[in-house]
Amino acid sequence: MFPISSTCRHAIAGLAVALVLAGAVPDTRAQMADPVHPMDALTYDEVNRTVALLREAGLADDGTRFPVITLKEMPKAEVLAWEPGEPFTRTAFVVMREDGETSEAVVDLTGGRIVSHEARPGAQPAIMQEEWDRARQATKEDPRWQEAMRRHGIEDLSKVSCAPMAPGYFPEEGFGKRRILRVPCFDQTIPLHPMQNRPIEGVLAIVDADTGEVIDVKEAEPVVVPDTAPGYGPDAIPARGPMKPVLNLTPGGSNIELEGALEVSWQDWSFHLRADRRSGLILSLARFRDKGEERLVAYQMAVSEMFVPYMDPDPAWAFRTYLDAGEFGLGYLISSLGVGTDCPHQAYYVTLLFPSDEGGMFKADRALCIFERNTGNPAWRHYDAGSGRLTSRPEVELVVRTIPTIGNYDYIVDWVFTNRGSIKVNVGATGFDAVKTVRSPDMEAETAGDDTEFGALVAPYVVAPYHDHFFSFRLDLDVDGPQNSFVRDLIVPEPAPAGSLRTSLWRLVSEPVGTEGRIVPTRNTHGEVWRLINPNRRTAMLKGHPGYQIEPGTGNTLSSLPDNDPAQKRAQFSSTRLWLTRYKPDELYAAGDYPMGEADRGLPRFIDDRQSIENADIVAWYTLGFHHVTRPEDWPILPTRWLGFTIRPMGFFDRDPSADLAPEFARPPSREDATQ
């Protein structure tokens, strides 16, 4: 996990969202200064007004930094009752940092007043660019660090780059509430891509991010940095010849409709998008049009947290237990998308604005893409052998994609909408492995056993330590409205009735879940179905309670760390596949609001009071993850590894909503049509 370059954060004074259809002139339909929807992100003008009001109240000055300036949403009932064109209130939630102290404020933008201001002693917000820069500079200027580097054979310190990292949370170290960063460095004598593939082992600085003081320089036995370590790109690996074009085109135009800031409609789906510095993207008010009725499926969905602990006990590695959303920010580190490579040419590419540390905004060009794709698979099909008749329909999906780049890792986050009424949530992990320099050139070396005890040799003298990736998704599903119940259907084998040709079968045993808590698979069953239902409504024809299922896919691994491990204490969400809580508007993050400086927060606290969730407003928290057992094929670039789950209708409709799909696509307009 490495910091961003300050050049990636452009101060702007313009529009908050700009839509660009690849190959076309930038679209003039852009979000203006005034929000048009109560869930719209704070605009440029609103961020400026927020900071101005705080300054006028004497709560902020030139030394104040703003790790959080975000929308404080209206009450859910008011949002659901709102109709387009009606007025709505706007409120900002702000976290401020100055002189080593953290405080929170709520600012009423409609009324132009400060609603509240509260000190948060000891709270550690996400790392800011100024802190990365300060720690990097302080490290390289420290005489102890310079001497240590020379003892490790590094003479030209101008060819060394340093990457301050989140420190982990280890109270026994004695740093108290000091805001520290740990700073490893890399040999840049030989220009390579990636730059971090020549780590300098045995030197680690610990820096106070508030003051720039280098608290300590940890030094261990030197490990000689190899002359070369394979990278990627044209200088390292010549590209093969190009393939013939394989394209996903929309010659008849797009089926996607975009309105307002980021209101999306596609086929029977509609939903709202909002850029968010911490979660990256927040998806709200997902509705499916069923026989003319706009039926609510989800009030809000987003990535809540990510946990990436490394499994190497080396002091320079054991602290690497990152909480990427809470410590860095998936929106703060969002990356620009490559046209035709990260997303298809015909996608809508959206430039987003995010509030900056200084209280302005920065621009992330092409940070979001929205596109439809023909998967090449049938949505459904059947061949009748008797008549020889084949009936099938093409599968087309809508994809909403962002790719935050958190240091060495790029995470492709997809929300995929289908004509079947399902939402697929997929994450693709790519980028490159974080590596350490070792003594072994190959697996026949005497030192290979020790060097590869906690990782795999991926290149001569290069080991990629084993690690985990866990993602917590906050799913505020509101099936036909906020009042829902949760049911777990257990697949239970049992003997067949007497006289049956069979000796055994299975049946479904439904168990309502009445209180908040963890959903732990029940023993002596052969699987479970998890679903939320609306007990206050019945479907038109079959008279069942409409429901949606949360269906696991790939990436079902859970954390193997014990609860008392310091890393696990900050990320307890990763030990359980599914958590259920009663909706509270301030319970947003699975590891808590300030996970960089505290443990035992978030979901374990949310469920402490064991509130009823029977016929209540329920939030589901789904954990996706995998153990990354590294291998040579992961180097020098990591092939994308996909994992995901599906939110699919279960009794929500009276039939398959894709049954009426057209057998073929509409004819694209001809040149003659265009001239008429």
Residue ranges and their predicted role:
Residues F2-G14:
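Bacterial N-terminal signal peptides that target proteins for export
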Residues A11-G23:
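Bacterial N-terminal signal peptides
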Residues T28-M32:
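Boundary at the C-terminal end of the N-terminal hydrophobic targeting segment
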Residues P38-L80, M128-F170:
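Short, non-transmembrane alpha-helical segments in secretory-pathway proteins
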Residues D61-T110, D156-D208, Q267, V400:
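Exposed beta-strand-loop-beta-strand "reactive/processing" segments of non-cytosolic proteins
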Residues L109, I114, E118-I127, R150-H152, ...:
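Extended effector regions of multi-domain proteins
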